[in-house]
Regions:
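Short helix N-cap motif at coil->helix boundaries in the Bergerat
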Residues: 206, 292-300
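Sensory modules in modular signal-transduction proteins
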Residues: 7-45
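Conserved micro-motifs of the catalytic ATP-binding
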Residues: 194-199, 237-240
Length: 361
């Protein structure tokens, strides 16, 4: 075999080796020759960039000036670079693109390896974290500022005013309770998220929980003038965590009592709690006949700190985390939360979870 044939064989072996190497990589990866043409690409790269074709210029498939400029610099300098690439079609995605030189036996840069790491989910989670911290800080700062203002007043102008002191201390107590509820909900949400991957398996009777929570909230319903009805006579045993499912029932029933006033102001307020089952699932639904929820609010109800009427929610002791907690609890139970509502026609919140294995059928 002459030298020319040997070099061709070596290049073929190297090409196959590189193709096999990137083929084993889980992230999109391509190899581009010094002429800018595609030499190899793995399956994830073809999925991300369907226009990729071996032997054609990379620019035809990848319309990313920053990445292509980095590729040219790497080919010229032999030093690796990392750039960000944002793709907006068909959906917005963000990639960290690493461009590394591939040297030939002579030491010359004959190609470059591009790997694309998807940062979309990490960036989304980071935005959620920042928003969450900002919202939590705001929710705590408001009552704290109020309490500090009353402390200044009590230490100053109202120092010797017994009537004002009693009034301000009552307000401070309520603001303190509000902060305590918020901290409790934040801690609960954190614990649920930490255990999200662990599915609870204890046999829990949803009917028993519904009756227990309804009995607990009966004084509140009476105070609010709400007729609370429970249809949960037969056991419906799901696989779950009792404390968490009690929390779910408390949130849904208490919300219905507090915010489900009759739309026409007639005073004919009622809340219906129903527990049912299918062959494989158990459900607890809470129906009110209040003002209902406008369609634009429905997709955002389970967002943390989202409120339809922030003033009303805070005045009734809401933290803005109740439905977020319900959603995460049901996700841990491999179940779901569904909401149906029409303005002026009330709302129904229902949670569904798989039956315990001993009660299926």
């Amino acid at each position: 075999m002459n030298k020319k044939a040997r070099r061709e064989l070596d290049r073929e072996i190297q090409s196959r080796f590189c193709a096999n190497l990137i083929g084993a990589m889980p992230e999109p990866a391509v190899i581009v020759g010094d002429d800018g043409r595609l030499a190899a690409a793995n399956e994830p790269a073809h999925t991300l960039l369907p226009a990729l074709k071996i032997g054609e210029p990379l620019v035809l498939a990848l319309r990313a000036p920053d990445v292509l400029d980095a590729l040219r610099r790497v080919m010229a300098s032999g030093r690796p670079e990392t750039v960000l690439w944002s793709e907006r079609v068909p959906v917005e995605r963000l990639f960290d693109v690493c461009v590394a030189p591939l040297a030939a036996e002579t030491g010359e840069i004959g190609a470059a390896l591009l790997t694309l790491r998807d940062l979309t989910e990490a960036r989304r989670v980071e935005r959620m974290r920042v928003d969450f911290i900002a919202n939590a800080s705001h929710e705590l700062r408001t009552p704290l500022a109020s309490m500090l203002g009353f402390v200044d007043t009590l230490q100053g102008p109202a120092r010797d005013d017994a009537k004002a002191r009693e009034k301000f201390l009552g307000i401070m107590r309520e603001q303190g309770r509000r902060m305590a509820r918020l901290v409790d909900d934040l801690l609960s949400l954190s614990r649920i998220e930490q255990n999200q991957h662990v599915r609870p398996e204890a046999p829990i009777d949803l009917a028993l929980i519904a009756r227990h929570v309804a009995d607990t909230l009966a004084p509140l319903a009476q105070e609010m003038g709400v007729d609370l009805n429970v249809d949960a006579s037969r056991p419906v045993v799901v696989a779950g965590d009792r404390d968490e499912l009690v929390r779910v029932a408390e949130n849904l029933i208490e919300n219905a009592i507090k915010y489900g006033a009759a739309a026409d102001g007639s005073g004919a307020d009622r809340v219906e709690v129903t527990v049912t089952r299918t062959a494989r699932e158990g459900s607890l639904s809470v129906r009110d006949y209040g003002r209902g929820i406008a369609p634009e609010h429905l997709p955002r109800l389970t967002e943390r700190f989202y409120r339809i009427d922030a003033g009303q929610s805070r005045s009734k002791g809401g933290t803005g985390l109740g439905l977020a907690i319900v959603k995460h609890i049901m996700a841990r139970h491999r179940g779901r939360l569904t909401v149906s509502s029409q303005p002026g026609n009330g709302s129904t919140f229902a949670v569904t979870a798989p039956l315990h294995s001993a009660h299926i059928g």
